[in-house]
Amino acid sequence: MKEDNKNKINRRDFFKLAGAGTLASAAALYGCSGNKNNGESESAALGEIPTDKMTYRTNPNTGERVSLLGYGCMRWPTRKRADGNGDEIDQEAVNDLIDYAIAHGVNYFDTSPAYVQGLSERATGIALKRHPREKFFLATKLSNFSPSTHSREESLAMYHRSFRDLQVDYIDYLLLHGIGMGGMEALRSRYLDNGMLDFLLKEREAGRIRNLGFSYHGDIEVFDYLLSRHDELKWDFVQIQLNYVDWRHAKEVNTRNTDAEYLYAELVKRNIPAVIMEPLLGGRLSRLNDHLMARLKQRRPQESVASWAFRFAGTFPDVLTVLSGMTYMEHLQDNLRTFSPLVPCTEEEFTLLEDTAQRMLQYPTVPCNDCKYCMPCPYGLDIPAILLHYNRCINEGNVPQNSQDENYREARRAFLIGYDRSVPRLRQANRCTGCGQCNPHCPQGIDIPAKLQEIDRFVEALKQETL
């Protein structure tokens, strides 16, 4: 197996590279096209996938060698239930994906009680139970977002349920989930005032938690506060959102976010390993427009567009693992090629990706990452599908500003036909009542009812031809 891939670029050189001056400015370009479901890969490259070339990073606290590609268990494949009443996880497909991943060197699996509408931990546990415990590292979270789960009793119940669903007697990596959502008030309610942080620290001492950390979204005050207590709490790792757009343009994507450049640097100062989420910015970095895609393809014609984003995230030397929610075998295979072994980005490639980020930001997409925390909607809306269709049409140039646009007829037809194909009519934006149940669950802080009502008004204007 390939040794840790840090020797090609040291930390000092890397920061010199990543922090070098103002990069090339960019002009506005249009479009990018959608892909299969979550867009985790543009296409699978040709050729055999090696089983012994995975790049590993060493956890400095434990000496464990962790695969640089980590499996995010947020997007397991689903199928219709036999009784027709909703969806269920396709366990056979999950088993196949996990078997293939382990056979090709992946050993880090990240789940949560909140994933796949509460079904992920159980499905992940069933699949991993078929493998020797020493073959994998399991990460899960205390996902007590809802005020009804903030009490010590409910939080403890969630924690112990994770052990049962995952069928393990210890957790390798346990995270305080989504700190920053709700600010300091939520942190105090979820983890401090109820004694849960103290409890988790004792669980780490007892060995039932091997590594304790947190994942961060939102309020930077909370991130800074928890890091300020590192000498006392000794965080073993921290999970952050990092990709070539969020590196320096996080606030341009979402005003409540903080640049990954800052987050990563703060972790490096304290020698805290970084686990990376959203390396594809919710799939958007695998759905570039034709022009941007062609620029990347010209450099590496045999590699997918998604591979550039994964290489960017994996190049940082203090990254322990890069998570990818791989729903389909083709996504898994493409990512395995990228990390077996990882080829770090060059200075020229960093410049190209910064330019790509600037060009992408010309288009006002909704910062939805398809996490599905907003689901299920009590009124049956498919919220992520609505927002993703809207984003896709923006990137493809199919959101006309008025009926005088040159391509108005084609864009109108593409938007409306695509809308009905992507979202069943009974689950479209016009069904939104504005109840707001979804809003507190969104880690990106989107005002979901307001955005759905905006999209519905746009759809009606297209139908009535009143733009």
Where do the language-model regions lie?
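N-terminal binding-site loop/beta-alpha segment at the start of enzyme catalytic domains
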Residues: 2-136, 194, 199, 205
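Twin-arginine (Tat) signal peptide motif
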Residues: 6-15, 374, 432-438
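Beta/alpha (TIM)-barrel catalytic core signal, keyed to glycine-rich beta->alpha loops juxtaposed to Asp/Glu
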Residues: 12, 46, 179-388, 392-415, ...
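Conserved, mostly hydrophobic/aromatic
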Residues: 59, 71, 109, 124, ...
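Acidic (Asp/Glu)-rich catalytic clusters
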Residues: 61-63, 125-133, 163-167, 227-233, ...
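Short, acidic/polar
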Residues: 87-101, 151-165, 220-227, 306-309
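Active-site groove signature of glycoside hydrolases
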Residues: 166-186
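Short Fe-S-cluster ligation motifs
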Residues: 398-432, 464-467
